[in-house]
Amino acid sequence: MEKKQRKQLVIQMLTAGIITFCLLWLLFYIKKYVPFGVHSLASKDADFQYLDFLAYLKDVFDGKNNIDYSFSKSIGGACIGVFSYYLSSPFILLLLLFDKSQLVLFVHVIITLKLACAAATFAFYLNRRFEEWNDGSVKKQALIIFLAVSYAVSQYGIAQACNIMWLDGFYMLPLIMLGVYRVVNGGRPVMLSVSVALAVLFNWYMGGINCVFACFWFLFEFAYSRLYSGDTKAEKTVIKDFAGKLGRFIYSMLAGVLISGVLFLPTIGAMRYSVRGSLDLGSLLDMSFIGGVSSVIDGYSLGAQSQKGSVSLY
């Protein structure tokens, strides 16, 4: 990448992130959210659970509790599962700068930072994925910034503000998508492996969801590359090409998951002894449909939320 292109990329990422950050804080000011009022995005589970977990982690930082085992967890228990699901985001380190009385403000700060980061990573994805299309013109740079901000403040990003740990997967997804694109088009698999590893480390649940999405995105990118490459190879050659790229994709994904094993494996071990719930594998074979097919279409309306019989997909 030339120096001018790198400069444009940095400007696009910073501009998209700053616009998103300022836009969200402007809305907080207008709607009187903390610190400008009494309203809070820490609602539902964030109010019932996450604030308590943040208070626990603040005690850990202050040397008043243990990250591995805590008596504040029910009657006492290992906390590695709680940490890896709720508290392993790199943004959580900013908690060191806040007091316990400022936890709601802290939640608002990391929400805006994570969504700003999502805008920056999506701008990075658009710039590198459509490199041939991006000629550096002001019009196309503005379009990249607009689309990046739109991604960050989409309904999913705003709706999941009360699930702050899920937003890490939101800003990591564009990097995984770019990694898939590079694997399909003969690039190095490092970006995909590292992105998957970080996504799982930051939140294993959303990291897993991103991995599932990556499988579908691989199929899309391969089909796109075949349709628009103008290549007229025989069917057997296409199958061989698909098998080779699929192998590189699987290898890259597995490498990422293995890297994340430093935290993921202890989490699995902790979950094995959890009595909070169980998985019925037989239910995976149940192909019944809850609700009507039309409810999926209704779920795309502005402000729609998922409920039993009516799913809102993103």
Language model features: what each stretch is:
Residues 29-130, 134-174, 198, 202-205, ...:
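Active-site lumenal/periplasmic loops and adjacent helix-entry segments of GT-C-fold
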Residues 1-33, 240, 244-249, 253:
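Start-transfer (signal-anchor) and selected internal transmembrane alpha helices
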Residues 33-37, 100, 131-132, 186, ...:
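Transmembrane helix-loop junctions in multipass membrane proteins, especially transporters and channels
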Residues 44-61, 90, 245-246, 253-314:
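Periplasmic/ER-lumenal interhelical loops and adjacent helix-loop junctions
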Residues 1-6, 133-137, 225-245:
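Membrane-interfacial, low-structure loops and terminal tails that flank and connect transmembrane helices
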Residues 46, 82, 101, 189-190, ...:
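Juxtamembrane loop-helix boundary motifs flanking transmembrane segments in multi-pass membrane proteins
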Residues 21, 112-125, 139-224, 245-268, ...:
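Membrane-embedded helix bundles of polyisoprenyl
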Residues 96-100, 132, 182-186, 295-306:
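Conserved helix-loop functional segments at active or binding sites
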